[in-house]
Structure formats: structure tokens, C-alpha cells
Amino acid sequence: MDSITTAASVVAAGLAVGLGAIGPGIGQGSAAQGAVEGIARQPEAEGKIRGTLLLSFAFMESLTIYGLVVALVLLFANPFAG
Amino acid sequence: MLVFPLLQPENDSSKEDQRELETLGESSQSTESNLNLGPVMEASIASSDEYVQLQQRIFRAALLVSALAVAITAFFFESQVAISLLIGALSGVLYLRLLARSIGQLGTSSKSVSKIQLVVPVVLVLAVSKLSQLELLPALLGFLLYKPSLIFQILLESRSRASS
């Protein structure tokens, strides 16, 4: 693998994780805030709130995982490494 | 002289109002002290049980989907691909278990959702890239096999809400 491909792969891996984690991070923060407020106001609805939070977190965090997988593939199993 | 008798009853009424307010305050204090939090705690415990049951349903569905996918893959493809898919599916279930545990701890023992579950896909990709017996694409597809069970669970919940 030449140096330009290596440098581009490293930069792309950083961008994939960094940019891919911004949106889910903000979304997870606001979702967790709403869930904690909801549990504090209605403790009897704790199970439903936590269940909804689990489902929404699983879908939100998958976006981060996609970026993470792309970055790891670029770093450790690079298909452009001739 | 004329003003004083007119003011006198007003003073009396204000004193009565003050007494009423004092008695109301005493009664509200007594109700606060006798406030029974038992039903709220029971409802909260029942709600926690509901969350545990939801987790168990999701894990069962994820394991069922994973077993079906691995069986179909083993029938149509090589055993190496099926093993990679199986390892990915088990990693997905482990990831979901860690996520559920960190959400269960939110608000009780921790103030934020931990990110320890993100170690699972990192270790999976690293292991697949280092071990030549495993393949990357089946492992990643296997890792994402927990999603159909989640979608199925959401559809079930929305249907039960619509029927109720």
C-alpha cells in the first residue's frame, strides 16, 4: 500500500467515526434526557419508557456502528491496499 | 369613631381567615405525613418486570432469527461462512445485552448510558481481520441480525396499542 492510500485511509477512518458519531450522540443525549424526565414524573411507566429507549437506542447506535465498521475496515482490512 | 367599628369586623374576618389557613396547613401537613407511596412503588416494580420481559422477548427473537439464518447459510454456503455468521450473530446478541443493561442502569446507578457495548463490534472486526478462518461480510451481516427482532417487537407493540 503506497503512502497516499495509507494517509487517505487513515483520514477517511477518522472522518467516518467522527462525523458518524455526531448525530447519534446528540440524539441519544436528548432521548436519554427525555426518558429520565419521564421516569421521574411517572415512575409507574418506567418499564415502557425503558423499553422504548432500548429500541430507539439500538437503532440510533447502529449509525455509529456503521461508521465504526467502515473505519475499522479501512484500517485493518483495506480493500484498496493493492 | 365611625371608622373603627367598620374596621373591626374586617380584622375579625382576617383573623378567621388566618385560622382557616392555619388549619388547612395543618391538615395538608398531616396528609403529607400519612402519604402512602406503596402503590407507586408497586407500579414501578411491575413496570421494571415489564422491561425485563421485553428484554427476554427481544433476546429470544434474536436467537431464533440467528439460528434460522445460520441454518440457511450452512445449507446454501460453506461452513466457514456459516461460522462467521454465527460469531457475528452471537456478538450482536451480546451487544444488545450490554445495551439493555446500560439502559437499565440509567437513572438508578448511572447518569448516562455507557458506551461499553461499542467494544463488541470493534473486537468482532479486529478478530475477523486477524483470523483467516473468518470472513468479514458474513460476520457483519450476522452482527446486524438483532435488528429484525427489534423491528418485529416494534410492530407487535404498535399493533397491541392500536387494538387497545
Swiss-Prot record, chain A:
GO terms for molecular function: lipid binding; proton-transporting ATP synthase activity, rotational mechanism. InterPro entries: ATP_synth_csu_bac/chlpt, ATP_synth_F0_csu, ATP_synth_F0_csu_DDCD_BS, ATP_synth_F0_csu_sf, ATPase_proteolipid_c-like_dom, F/V-ATP_Csub_sf. The chain crosses the membrane at residues 7-27, 57-77. It is found in: Cellular thylakoid membrane. F(1)F(0) ATP synthase produces ATP from ADP in the presence of a proton or sodium gradient. F-type ATPases consist of two structural domains, F(1) containing the extramembraneous catalytic core and F(0) containing the membrane proton channel, linked together by a central stalk and a peripheral stalk. During catalysis, ATP synthesis in the catalytic domain of F(1) is coupled via a rotary mechanism of the central stalk subunits to proton translocation. Belongs to the ATPase C chain family. This is ATP synthase subunit c.
